[in-house]
Amino acid sequence: MQDEHKQGNRNLPEIHYASRDWTSKHPGRHNGETHLKTRDLVIQLRGLRIRKWHSCLFPWGTRLTDRCTLQMECEPDGAGVRPVAGDVAGPEESLQLREADLKEIRHPKLHTTGRSLCSERDAQRCHLRRQSV
C-alpha cells in the first residue's frame, strides 16, 4: 500500500475518520444496542474530485462491514468538504471497505445529497447536516 501511495495510484482511496461523543440507540440490524459514538468517514479517490461522507453508528471495536450507514453526503467537486483533522480514534486496521463500497464511489450519483442508505435510521438525527471542521 505504501508503494502504491508513492506511485500516485489514481484509484487509491484516501480515508479519514474521527469520532464524536454522543449516545444513541438504533433499532435496525443492531438489535437496539446502545452506540457510544459515531465515526465520520471521508472516502476520496485521487483521480476524481469526489468525496463522500458516511456517518456510522456502531460500538467501538467492531468493523464497518455489515453495519448500517445512517447518512451520506456527496459533493462532486469536494467543495465545502475536507478531511477531518484531530480527534482521530480507533485502530486503522479495524476499518474495512467492501468492493461494493468502492464501486459506489467510482460510479457515484453526483447530485445526490443527504441520501439515506438505512431505512431504520435514527429519526432524531436523520436530517442533521454536517458541521464545518
UniProtKB/Swiss-Prot annotation:
Q: Note the effect listed for R130G.
A: In strain: Isolate Sp103
InterPro entries listed in its UniProt record: Birna_VP5
Q: Which residue stretches does the UniProt record annotate as biased composition, category Basic and acidic residues?
A: 17-35
Q: Which one Pfam family would you cite for this protein?
A: Birna_VP5
* Reported effect, A100V: In strain: Isolate Sp103
Q: Where is this region: Disordered?
A: 1-35
What else is on record for this protein? Answer: The sequence shown is that of Isolate NVI-020. The highly pathogenic isolates NVI-013, NVI-015, NVI-023 and Sp122 have a truncated VP5 protein.
The entry's family comment says: Belongs to the avibirnavirus/aquabirnavirus VP5 protein family.
Function noted in UniProt: VP5 is not required for viral replication in vivo and its absence does not alter the virulence characteristics of the virus or the establishment of persistent IPNV infection.
Its recorded name reads Protein VP5
Which taxonomic lineage does the organism of this UniProt entry have? Viruses, Riboviria, Orthornavirae, Birnaviridae, Aquabirnavirus
Gene from which the chain derives: VP5
